[in-house]
Amino acid sequence: MSRLFTLVLIVLAMNVMMAIISDPVVEAVGCEECPMHCKGKMAKPTCDDGVCNCNV
């Protein structure tokens, strides 16, 4: 039973470490998806050089 508990603790510790170490990736939204991407933010979508910008 203690081996199982130790294994669970190791797995949980590894998950926490991976969450801390991994940096958040900013998803680039293309011009095609721009209107749907900005719709939830109540912003006006504009596309500059293939990159979506949501202007409030």
From Swiss-Prot:
Query: Which pairs are disulfide-linked?
Result: 31-47, 34-52, 38-54
Asked if Secreted is a keyword of the record, the answer is: yes
Q: Where is the signal peptide?
A: 1-19
A GO cellular component term found in this entry reads: extracellular region
Where is it expressed, tissue-wise?
Answer: Expressed by the venom gland.
Which residues form the pro-region?
20-28
- The reply on keyword Cell membrane is no
**Record's SUPFAM superfamilies?**
Scorpion toxin-like
Q: What is its main location?
A: secreted
Q: Which domain of life is it from?
A: Eukaryota
Q: Which Pfam families does the record match to this protein?
A: Toxin_6 (PF05453)
Domain statement: Has the structural arrangement of an alpha-helix connected to a beta-sheet by disulfide bonds (CSalpha/beta).
Q: Which family does it belong to?
A: Belongs to the short scorpion toxin superfamily. Potassium channel inhibitor family. Alpha-KTx 09 subfamily.
Q: What's this protein's name?
A: Potassium channel toxin alpha-KTx 9.8
Instruction: Please give the organism.
Output: Buthus israelis (Israeli scorpion)
Species classification: Eukaryota, Metazoa, Ecdysozoa, Arthropoda, Chelicerata
